[in-house]
Amino acid sequence: MKVLIVGAGGREHALASKINQSPIVDKVYAIPGNDAMVNIAEVHSEIAESDHQAILHFAQHNAIDWVIIGPEQPLIDGLADLLRNANIKVFGPGQDAAQIEGSKLFAKQLMDKYRIPTAEYKEVSSRNEALQYVETCDLPIVIKKDGLAAGKGVIIAFTREDALDGVKKIYQEEKGKVVFESYLEGEEFSLMTFVNGDYAVPFDCIAQDHKRAFDNDQGPNTGGMGAYCPVPHIDASVLEQTNKEIAQPIAKAMAQEGHDFFGLLYIGAILTKDGPKVIEFNARFGDPEAQVLLTRLESDLMQLIIDLENCQPIHFNWKDEAVVGVMLASKGYPGSYEKGHEISGFNLDSHYYVSGLKKEGQCFVNSGGRVILAIGEGPTVEKAQANAYEHARQIKSDNLFYRNDIGNKAITK
């Protein structure tokens, strides 16, 4: 079997690595991939992930059996539909179903209609309307841009001044939809769920992401500065409740409304005093949650995808070890940052997943905001954390930073 991974980040590096381990897979390709994937996949960086026709031509020319789409943009732009219409199997939803990530408003309206627990919300359609709303709304307030924003389109405002600044920041133009949400307090967690129509199978291991740029959850939101799994202080009963009240109902709601979803639904949830509630949905694996979950997963991912396609029972096997991933990012991220700084001290092995590196001559240099995820495994989260930071410290660069508290919530509970 030949499998093509679409995407260039750490999530796709982890997907390629995991698919490459499958005994039923003969060859893995990556478009555009990155320079760190060359040991596990045939990398075709000459094709852009936005060039859907070229991806289709490549898949047909190379007799690709399955395409796994990693990032959100190609899903929302309809790559899965194009490939499926050419009778190529795809793990990832079509454009219509990918709206669950592509539009915050679509997701909120669906949850509202089907009474899926989430924060109360208000929709506004212009900068002026938003500025008026924040003059009198309850605080704190969460401000979300309706479309995609690479994990950086969310502002939490604790003061009236912050709320006004947030609106001005999100509204670069006068018109556009923004969703205001009441602020939810509690412990956040990420639940990946396999979905095929109304058949939904959540992973029975959750992960916890760290969205803020700096220690102690300070600074702006990012795409994710680290993650770990399992989450020992959130017990199995919470997972069961999340499945019953969120995962199953949202799959059924999507099917009922005619939005045919096949792929991975990411449920970003928060455990409040009233139980789990939805913060966001994504139409694909989280990054960096994918890297830690796929490191811990012992099951054959390709076989699980085929079982999902056939609506067969899915059983997950996990390593006993905990996994912690620490993201090293370019200084300045999630704002502006310099590229082209040399980065060394790491091997292309299972201790690292690469997001934003490229090879220039014999050296690797940074080419993105999030650069490389250092992985640690151990019998406890604490031991896995120590190993992850040991691997992070081995990386040499004058232009990287990382958080020092990834996994602390599991250790201090």
Curated annotation (Swiss-Prot):
**Keyword Ligase belongs to the record:** yes
Q: Example GO biological process term?
A: purine nucleobase biosynthetic process
For this entry, the protein name equals Phosphoribosylamine--glycine ligase
Instruction: Please give the PANTHER family that the UniProt record associates with this protein.
Output: PHOSPHORIBOSYLAMINE--GLYCINE LIGASE (PTHR43472), PHOSPHORIBOSYLAMINE--GLYCINE LIGASE, CHLOROPLASTIC (PTHR43472:SF1)
Q: Can you name the source organism? A: Staphylococcus epidermidis (strain ATCC 35984 / DSM 28319 / BCRC 17069 / CCUG 31568 / BM 3577 / RP62A)
All copies of the ATP-grasp domain together span 108-310
| Entry's Gene Ontology molecular function annotations | ATP binding; metal ion binding; phosphoribosylamine-glycine ligase activity
NCBIfam families named in the record: purD
Q: Where do the annotations place ATP binding?
A: 134-190
Q: Give the matching Pfam families.
A: GARS_A, GARS_C, GARS_N
Keyword rRNA-binding listed = no
Instruction: Kindly list the cofactors needed.
Output: Mg(2+); Mn(2+)
Matches recorded under InterPro entries: ATP-grasp, ATP_grasp_subdomain_1, PreATP-grasp_dom_sf, PRibGlycinamid_synth_ATP-grasp, PRibGlycinamide_synth, PRibGlycinamide_synth_C-dom, PRibGlycinamide_synth_C_sf, PRibGlycinamide_synth_CS
What domain of life is recorded for the organism?
Bacteria
Which residues are noted in the entry as Mg(2+)-binding?
Answer: 280, 282
Q: Which SUPFAM superfamilies match?
A: Glutathione synthetase ATP-binding domain-like, PreATP-grasp domain, Rudiment single hybrid motif
Pathway given for this chain reads: Purine metabolism; IMP biosynthesis via de novo pathway; N(1)-(5-phospho-D-ribosyl)glycinamide from 5-phospho-alpha-D-ribose 1-diphosphate: step 2/2
- What keywords were assigned to this record? ATP-binding, Ligase, Magnesium, Manganese, Metal-binding, Nucleotide-binding, Purine biosynthesis
What does the UniProt cofactor note say? Answer: Binds 1 Mg(2+) or Mn(2+) ion per subunit.
Regarding protein family, the annotation reads:
Belongs to the GARS family.
Its recorded reaction(s) are:
5-phospho-beta-D-ribosylamine + glycine + ATP = N(1)-(5-phospho-beta-D-ribosyl)glycinamide + ADP + phosphate + H(+)
Provide the E.C. number(s) assigned to this enzyme: 6.3.4.13
